[in-house]
């Protein structure tokens, strides 16, 4: 099992190109199931989760060509409507094949999801929405089985804001008969990117980027060509890395407008951030100020940046509160940050972080995707060497992170389990 070895204390400088968004690429790949014509995608990140999704689609009979950030999908010969446990257990986003399969083929059998160990994240909103559209759904032997001759448009009000739920129901609705209205829809940019692809494929969707999506169902979708939006979480992670380690770094192929909640907090921390249409420059040469924040749905501060910003707060001057409102059990990185010398206590869904002047390198273990990124950020600032175990979590969501950091001057190397 690979590990990362990081020697702290080196400021970062140079340029980094931000990859395509994982959380846009995964639903967009699933959208390829909705048409018998080819869908050509660009700026697809090379991540473990993307490779897993392509493997799943391949098992279903989708013909795939991929390489150099490009993926072409041809779902004209899909012959297997099952997403098995072996695939779904490693990646929750596999649930996103449910809506497209039921909408186009009238049947789907999807294992109940796994993925990051950060709370329940139930799929009941997906199921309720599809049932409202006329699907017959049973759950037995660990599988969700859905059947429908043709889904019927309806009004769906989700009990909670759910990103994957919105995406699944949106993909189902584009081929349903009549009008579907999704109220309390997730507004995340990644949902918007999926919607834009669907429109390019011939779907009729109004309200993109709002919490009310109105979809007029069509009989079939055609092929399309689409470029995946930049990954705002990868961009935010690099911004926090520079803020912690110090330095002067320019991010390319980024969308500053969808990062405003993060950059606002970075400026509050004393970081200098400049931005243009598709670039950001971040500079830092001092200890950050402690910043209190609360996670919430877009456009508020993203839960997927909570761990990285907490790592920054560990070395800040002052005390901060971090309130996690989206997922329970999303403070698993706290114990590991404390091993590096951080001073963090937890009370329910709130973490109290008292900044320390210096962290010290140690052996730590990644527990989930964003937690692993927080340990990398802390290690860049720590005194001495840090060994991060279980970095397969990092590989699920970051495209060559150690390569990009090394190019910026960080001392990072990947070692196999036998070398560590």
UniProtKB/Swiss-Prot annotation:
Binding site for phosphoenolpyruvate: 22-23
Gene3D superfamilies given in the database record: Enolpyruvate transferase domain
Pathway: Cell wall biogenesis; peptidoglycan biosynthesis
Swiss-Prot/TrEMBL keywords: Cell cycle, Cell division, Cell shape, Cell wall biogenesis/degradation, Cytoplasm, Peptidoglycan synthesis, Pyruvate, Transferase
Active site positions: 116
Domain of life according to the entry: Bacteria
Localization terms from the record: Cytoplasm
EC number(s) reported in the record: 2.5.1.7
One GO CC annotation: cytoplasm
GO molecular function annotation: UDP-N-acetylglucosamine 1-carboxyvinyltransferase activity
Predominant location category: cytoplasm
CDD domains named among the record's database cross-references: UdpNAET
Alphabetized InterPro entries for the sequence: Enolpyruvate_Tfrase_dom, Enolpyruvate_Tfrase_sf, MurA_subfamily, RNA3'P_cycl/enolpyr_Trfase_a/b, UDP_GlcNAc_COvinyl_MurA
GO BP field: cell division; cell wall organization; peptidoglycan biosynthetic process; regulation of cell shape; UDP-N-acetylgalactosamine biosynthetic process
Annotated positions of the 2-(S-cysteinyl)pyruvic acid O-phosphothioketal modification: 116
This protein's record includes keyword Zinc: no
Enzyme class: transferase
Catalyzed chemical reaction(s): phosphoenolpyruvate + UDP-N-acetyl-alpha-D-glucosamine = UDP-N-acetyl-3-O-(1-carboxyvinyl)-alpha-D-glucosamine + phosphate
Binding-site residues for UDP-N-acetyl-alpha-D-glucosamine, renumbered to this chain: 92, 121-125, 304, 326
HAMAP family: MurA
Family named by the database record: Belongs to the EPSP synthase family. MurA subfamily.
Function (record text): Cell wall formation. Adds enolpyruvyl to UDP-N-acetylglucosamine.
Protein name: UDP-N-acetylglucosamine 1-carboxyvinyltransferase
Source species: Paraburkholderia xenovorans (strain LB400)
Gene that this sequence comes from: murA
